[in-house]
Swiss-Prot record:
Its cofactor is Zn(2+); Mg(2+); Co(2+). InterPro entries: PdxA_epsilonprot, PdxA_fam. GO terms for molecular function: 4-hydroxythreonine-4-phosphate dehydrogenase activity; cobalt ion binding; magnesium ion binding; NAD binding; zinc ion binding. A divalent metal cation binds at H156, H195, H251. GO terms for cellular component: cytoplasm. GO terms for biological process: pyridoxal phosphate biosynthetic process; pyridoxine biosynthetic process. It comes from Helicobacter pylori (strain G27). The lineage of its organism: Bacteria, Pseudomonadati, Campylobacterota, Epsilonproteobacteria, Campylobacterales. Catalyzes the NAD(P)-dependent oxidation of 4-(phosphooxy)-L-threonine (HTP) into 2-amino-3-oxo-4-(phosphooxy)butyric acid which spontaneously decarboxylates to form 3-amino-2-oxopropyl phosphate (AHAP). It holds the Pfam family PdxA. This is 4-hydroxythreonine-4-phosphate dehydrogenase. The keyword DNA damage does not apply. Belongs to the PdxA family. Pathway: Cofactor biosynthesis; pyridoxine 5'-phosphate biosynthesis; pyridoxine 5'-phosphate from D-erythrose 4-phosphate: step 4/5. Substrate binds at H126, T127, K259, N268, R277.
Length: 307
């Protein structure tokens, strides 16, 4: 069977993305046919910063139509509008290749959201771009590994705005889309307030969550969704034995336990997108950029998922 062709967007070149590309290429090449969306010159510069530890000549690259950012010992680990613009163009090209079926999937390396903002990119991140590009699809950010998966009802929004987003109709649509994509038989849904609201004592959001769960189960014809569960105990070992699938109303409530347990091996997947996309579950790690310290397990797992 022919190996799948995977487009790999470079992420922010001032972070660990290029180190991950170089140190992982031999393993990645065994799983798929990687196409690195980056100018070869930048990979050469990255390898020089990594003391020429890796082979660069055999990597299949595609130049990006964007000015080359500076990459040297004084720029690494720093936010740059040029690097932000370049990482966005690399990602956008990956989506274009996937849309035209020139690649089978895309793997996105970490971007810096502030760099995108400085480059006047009108999207918070990868998932926000995908939601705008594919508006007819209920795209869901899910992170996890085989032991634990967490779908995020809200992702990169301020915590103070989440309460207003919790509406029965929107949550029912989300829950049904999550179940359809994952085919999960049981999904545990985290509550929003302390003690899942304590029957309305601590806010009304959890009452809406309960109604959405009931309506979703009724639509499915079986009790798929459990909850809302008090989030402080939802990820206890006995709860995780019930199912690996969870839904969280907010970003950190769901991802804090996931990353505490499985940070190195988890990946980020865009459910319900018309293209196949996966990513690492970590950021640019500016603090260890070009020090040969980056753990590549999450990146390799993302590639394996796509391949």
């Amino acid at each position: 069977m022919a190996k799948k062709k995977i487009a790999i967007s470079c992420g922010d070149i001032q972070g660990v993305g290029l180190e991950l590309i170089l140190k992982s290429h031999k393993e990645v090449n065994a799983f798929c046919e990687p196409l690195y969306l980056i100018d070869g010159e930048l990979l050469e510069r990255a390898n020089q910063l990594l003391h020429n530890a890796y082979e660069t000549k055999t990597l299949n690259t595609l130049a990006i139509h964007s000015p080359l950012p500076l990459l040297n010992s004084s720029t690494i680990g720093k936010v740059s509008a040029q690097s932000g613009a370049y990482s966005f163009e690399s990602f956008k090209k990956a989506c274009e290749l996937a849309d035209s079926k020139e690649v089978d999937g895309i793997c996105t390396l970490p971007i810096n959201k502030l760099a995108w903002q400085q480059a006047q990119i009108p999207f918070v991140g990868h998932t926000d771009f995908l939601k705008q590009r594919y508006k007819d699809h209920q795209i869901i950010m899910m992170l996890g590994c085989s032991k634990l998966f967490v779908g995020l009802f809200s992702d990169h929004v301020p915590l103070g705005a989440v309460s207003q987003l919790i509406q029965v109709k929107a949550l029912v649509k989300f829950l049904l889309a999550f179940q359809k994509s994952t085919q999960a038989k049981i999904v545990q849904v985290c509550g929003f307030n302390p003690h899942a609201g304590e029957e309305g004592l601590f806010g009304k959001e959890d009452e809406k969550i309960l109604k959405a769960i009931q309506k979703s189960n009724q639509t499915l014809g079986f009790e798929c969704f459990l909850g809302p569960l008090p989030a402080d105990s939802a990820f206890a070992p006995n709860k995780r034995q019930i199912t690996p699938f969870y839904v969280s109303m907010s970003h950190d409530v769901g991802l804090a336990p996931l990353k505490a347990l499985y940070f190195d091996e988890s990946i980020n997947v865009s459910l319900n997108a018309p293209i196949l996309r996966a990513s690492t579950d970590h950021g640019t790690a500016f603090d260890i950029a070009y020090q040969n310290k980056a753990n590549n397990k999450s990146y390799l797992n993302a590639i394996k998922y796509l391949a």
